[in-house]
Structure formats: structure tokens, C-alpha cells
Amino acid sequence: MMTAESRETTGLSPQAAQEKDGIVIVKVEEEDEEDHMWGQDSSLQETPPPDPEVFRQRFRRFCYQNTFGPREALNRLKELCHQWLRPEVNSKEQILELLVLEQFLSILPKELQVWLQEYRPDSGEEAVTLLEDLELDLSGQQVPGQVHGPEMLARGVVPLDPVQESSSFDHHETAQSHFKHSSRKPRLLSRALPATHVPAPHHEGNPRDQAMASALLTADSQAMVKIEDMAVSLILEEWGCQNLARRNLNRDSRQMNLGNVFSQGSENRNGNESTSKAEVKEDSTSHGEIAGRFQKEFGEKREQQGRVVERQQKNPEEKTGKEKKEPGPPTAKEKKPSTGERGPREKGKGLGRSFSLSANFNNTPEEAPSGAKTHRCDECGKCFTRSSSLIRHKIIHTGEKPYECNECGKAFSLNSNLVLHQRIHTGEKPHECNECGKAFSHSSNLILHQRIHSGEKPYECNECGKAFSQSSDLTKHQRIHTGEKPYECSECGKAFNRNSYLILHRRIHTREKPYKCTKCGKAFTRSSTLTLHHRIHARERTSEYSPASLDAFGAFLKSCV
């Protein structure tokens, strides 16, 4: 008993052994346990099962060049994935947990990945708990020094007064004590904290552990900077909107020239604008480099959005100018003396105009994040990245066709469709085949034509395996298996699986015979029947030669030999 107790005690630091005077409850470290286990007789030890991490790395690092073909590569990948995930042992939830854990570890900083690999977490919750414990102890250890100025603002760190300092150290001691006696690894704190943050009695961590801890602290400080930067940008953006709205209101008031009432309001707005500019300048100075960086970053964007708002306000300004030039009796508003205040109606007008400017400013397409589909169609629910695309899409539901062909009068909903249609009249065929030189008016027709040369048949029937170069041919073929006959004759009710068959059938009722023989003038409903008819005339030409003439011609050939 004493031997085992002394062996366990050797795995502890001197400080941990002197913490209690009574019974010392310790947990042997992973390295000591492994040394003790392998120190026994090797003949008594069973071969440990393969590590799943080994199979995972084999699965992820598998290369196609190591195989002799795609089928062998796929089978090898299935085998490696089976060895890693072990579906015969693990449930679906466990397999899902393994995949999520792998992805979670891959997005962590390198230092944290190396640190977590030592503990081999079995689930994502266990990995998160380890990181949260580490972060809690690091936050308890961090006591900022006496640093002032822009660097403190950028990091979001505020100097601690003596009361806060003492409470911070108390919190650190409590967290450290809890961490030592938890079920986690005993050297977690000493490994996690860099030497500058670990108290003096503890030994210093190695450089790799210090880098890992600094990564955690850097992530925290970056999060603080991002939050503060976002607040600064929102403040500047809001003030930019207000200043732009005020400038537009001042311009409108000068154009309308409605008397001293608007002049007084313009002076008030100019005063407010100068006050806002002073506030922005003061706030930018206090934020230092952060505000300057955001002003530079969003300068061009604000300028572009300002031009958009001016274009949106162009038509209302022209309308206002026309109304101003129309003659008429003087209104009560013009006769009203200047009192230095606006009436309720004029205040409402000013607020309404300012609100519409803000709404237009906030709804500009440039405000939306890149790739975000914020414009949604109310009819079908389809979303678009730009409002112009949504407007073009809505034409489909309304049935509007504003683009009309000047040649035939046919109308289209999109201008691009009109351009393609006009090539029928002009005969333009800009898409030419490199193999045979044949030209097409549509690029899609060229793609279908090129499959004739390449022999590509990407559309395959699931029933019989027959392949086709066009999807329409596959659709027609599949009707043979399904028995679908969507084309029905309105005269007799007979149905067909192809439209061409229905057209041929209708000629029976209409007695139309478009295919006419040039020799005898006989007409037929089908081109195939005309081809068979041509053979009759061909046999007639061969029968013009009598048998006697043929025998004489044969004798002549023999004499030549």
C-alpha cells in the first residue's frame, strides 16, 4: 500500500504534495499511468485496439494517385471510413458526433488544436467544456497593467482599481482551486497559462503552451475590437445618413423659396448639422485609429450611396420645381408672417421628407451583404440579390411584355429574349461549330450540336440504360416505359406519346398530303411513304433494258477478258 502511494506521489509537483497535511487525494497523470502500465510484464498486456485517430488520418490523407482506378479508390475510401466511424459499433448519433467534433477541432487555432489532441475528447461537449474551463481560468488570471491611450481603447481593457484588482485575484484563486480538484487533467492550468500570468509558486509553461494561451487571449481581444469597431461604424453610418438627409432638405428649401419660415428652419438645421459634425469629430478623436480606419473604409461607399439617394430624389425635385413655376393666387402660407417657428403641418412635412430619405438610404442594394438574397418575390417566394432582378422576375407573374419586335410585332417580357428573337429576322448566327463550321443563333443549340461530334450522351434512361444527347429525347423515350400519352386527337380521341405522331394522325382527318412526287404528281401524308414510292420509279428505269440486251452486254465483257 505504501509503495503504491509513493508511486502516485511521484507524479505530482512538490507544491501539490504539500497542499494538505492529511490524506492526499491525487490523480495519476496520463503519462505516468502509461509508463506504469508498460513497465509491467509485456507478456501480460493485450494488444491495444487501433486508435480511431489513425484511421481518421488515413481517410483524410488518402490520395487518388495511390490507386489503380476510380473504382478501387472509392472502395478504399469506403473501407477507411468504415474503419474510422465503425458503424457496426457506433450508432447514428455517435457517428454524427464524431463528424461534428472533427469539424469543430479543424476550425480552432493551431495552438488549441494541439492542446486538445493531448486530451482526446470523445465528443464536442467534452471539447467545449475543456476550452471553457481554460478560458475561465485565463480570464481570472488576466490583470491588465497600467496602460492608457489608444492601445487600451483598441483592446477594450479598462484599468482596474484596487478593489477590482483584489476581487480579480480572489476569483483567480477560487477558479484555480476548483480546477485543481476537478476530474480534468491536473496540469491543465499550468499547461494553459503562459509564464507571465501564472503565479510565482507554479512552474512556467513551455513555449508551445504559452503560444496556445496567447491565442485564446488574442481571440478574446479581437472579439472586443470587433464589437467596438461595429459600434463606431454604426454611429458614423447613422450620422452620415442624418447629415445627408439634412443637406437634401436644405437644398429643397432653397429651391422652393417659401419665405422666412423655411429660412429660419434652414438656419436651425444648419446649426444642428454643425453640432453633429462637431460630435462626430470629437467621437472620432476619442476612438483614435479605429474611427479613422472605418471612415476611410466606408468613405467611397457613403459617396456612392449619396449619389443613389440624389438620383432617387431627382424626380420629386423636378415636380416641385414645376409646381413652383405655375401661376396662381398667393397662398396663406406665403402671406403668413415669419414667427421663427414652424406650424404643425410644416413640421410634419419636414419629418416626412426626412423619414423617406432615411428609408431610401437604408434600402439601397449596396447596403446588403455580398451574395445575400434579401429581395423576395411575394408570388412564388423566390429570392434575389438585387431589386432590379426582382423587378424583372415579377414581369413573369404579371404577364407584361414590354419588349416588342419591330418586324413581326411579337412581344417579350425580357430584353434578352427579344435580342435572341431578332436574330431570326436578321439571320445572324454568331455561334459557330469548330468541327464542321455550322453556325447557330443560340449558344444552347451549339452545345447540343457539339454532342454529335463528341458522342456525348449525358441523359441515360434508368429503366433500360439507353442514353441520349438531349433531355427532351430522354423525356420522350421514358413515355414508352410509363405508357404516358399526353397528346390526344380532338377528332377521334386517340392519344399518342409524341406530338409528331399526333400531327401525322391529324392528316387522316384533314386529308392533307404535303409530300408530292415530282415524277407522277401523286401526293402522300408521310415523307416515308413518298420514299417508298420513289423506288417504284427506280425499278421502272431498270426494266427499260430487255433481257437480250443484257445478254449481249455480258458477252461483250467476256470477250474483253
UniProtKB/Swiss-Prot annotation:
Top-rank taxon, per record: Eukaryota
GO term, biological process aspect, one: regulation of DNA-templated transcription
Matching SUPFAM superfamilies: beta-beta-alpha zinc fingers, KRAB domain (Kruppel-associated box), Retrovirus capsid dimerization domain-like
Domain SCAN box intervals: 56-138
Region (Disordered): 1-51, 163-187, 260-372
Compositionally biased residues, Basic and acidic residues: 276-286, 294-349
Pfam families, per database record: KRAB, SCAN, zf-C2H2
Zinc finger annotations (C2H2-type) as residue ranges: 375-397, 403-425, 431-453, 459-481, 487-509, 515-537
Residue numbers bearing the Phosphoserine modification: 13
UniProt xrefs under CDD domains: KRAB_A-box, SCAN
Record keyword Iron-sulfur present: no
Basic residues: compositionally biased ranges: 178-187
Role, per record: May be involved in transcriptional regulation.
Family membership noted in the UniProt record: Belongs to the krueppel C2H2-type zinc-finger protein family.
Protein name: Zinc finger protein with KRAB and SCAN domains 1
